[in-house]
Curated annotation (Swiss-Prot):
The gene is fliL. This is Flagellar protein FliL. Belongs to the FliL family. The chain crosses the membrane at residues 13-35. It comes from Escherichia coli (strain K12). GO terms for biological process: bacterial-type flagellum-dependent swarming motility; chemotaxis.
């Protein structure tokens, strides 16, 4: 063999591993890009979960004489409910709901309600009072939160 033939063969053998390496690098890059784009799409879908809009039910304000002499509670509340079915049940039985709440409010002590802890306890009591079924055979009402819209002690 001549020197020219040997150098041509060595150049060819040098190019083959380089081309194989470039091909593997291109395939790896394409695979990573494909995997990464699907990961981003999956993360976007997780973030785009539809958050249900809150269901609120505003009640008219209550004016109640407290157990203390000459003390009056003026209170307005809005209920945050789990779903529209609960809202329609509460609306259908509104006189029963208001009666339960009036009885609950009239049993309160003004000194206790003046504190933040007393107001938080009242929220828990409202949830408990309204969670019991309005009529036998109905499911419990799911009141997730009680929001004060007016609160005056006189």
């Amino acid at each position: 063999m001549t020197d020219y033939a040997i150098s041509k063969k060595s150049k060819r053998s040098l190019w083959i591993p380089i081309l194989v390496f470039i091909t593997l690098a291109a395939c790896a890059s394409a695979g990573y890009s494909y995997w990464h784009s699907h990961q981003v799409a999956a993360d976007d879908k997780a973030q785009q979960r539809v958050v249900p809009s809150p269901v609120f039910y505003a009640l008219d304000t209550f004016t109640v004489n407290l157990g203390d002499a000459d003390r009056v509670l003026y209170i307005g509340i809005t209920l945050r409910l789990k779903d529209e079915a609960t809202r329609s049940r509460l609306s259908e039985y509104l006189p029963e709901v208001r009666s339960r709440l009036l009885l609950l409010f009239s049993r309160q002590d003004a000194a206790v309600l003046a504190t933040e802890e007393g107001k938080k306890n009242l929220i828990a009591e409202i949830k408990t009072t309204l969670s019991t079924p309005l009529v036998a055979g109905q499911p419990k009402q799911d009141v997730t939160d009680v929001l004060y819209t007016a609160f005056i002690l006189r």
